[in-house]
Amino acid sequence: LCIAGSKKKTELPQKRKKIGFFIGNNFYDYLTAEENLHYYRQLKDIKDKEEVKRVLNLVGLEGVTSKYGSFSMGMKQRLGIANALLGSPEILLLDEPINGLDPQGIADIRTLIVSLNRKQNMTIIVSSHILGELEHTANKFGFVHQGTVLKEITHDDLKVKRSAVQIYVGDLEKARSVLKQNNIPVLQESSAYKSLEDYYFDLVGGKRCE
């Protein structure tokens, strides 16, 4: 295990403090967002009480006084991310952060993740089965199959390595025979890229639902 460039077992406990984890929501229904986070702040031995307000502001839950039990799914996910942000970690691990959300909730979490990455200069690792959504959010992808990382690519790799061009012409039959001569007017040309989902199934095999 290597964290922040270190493999020394004696350094791992300290290095782990630089990582924030979001794995499900373990909060008390009868407490507010702020009360729940103060509980976890103390568990993490964070002395600064203002840290709770800071992370609530980052995820857009500042001023919310209702109990956790009345939260929407999107609010619960935001609070889970806020908990992971306590202590200003350098790396944020998010496990299925958009699971169970409606389209608006997904868009909100996507915006939040991008904002944290850009404004807080934070490395964010997202584990998700919703590949189409990752394609809109991430800039680097790692494909894991049966516990093994098969390949890592960048967003640009996805386009460059798996690109195709579709050309629409007025006479398809004629185009098939004389296209190489380059003397047929092209009515429309567009670039078509394989999606992240397409790339995954090409890599590991299997068939997706159409």
For the regions a protein language model found, what residue spans apply to each?
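Hydrophobic anchor residue at the start of the ABC signature
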Residues: 81
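Conserved catalytic motifs of ABC-family nucleotide-binding domains
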Residues: 88
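Catalytic Walker B motif of ABC-type/P-loop ATPase nucleotide-binding domains
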Residues: 92-96
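Conserved ABC ATPase "signature" region
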Residues: 38, 49-64
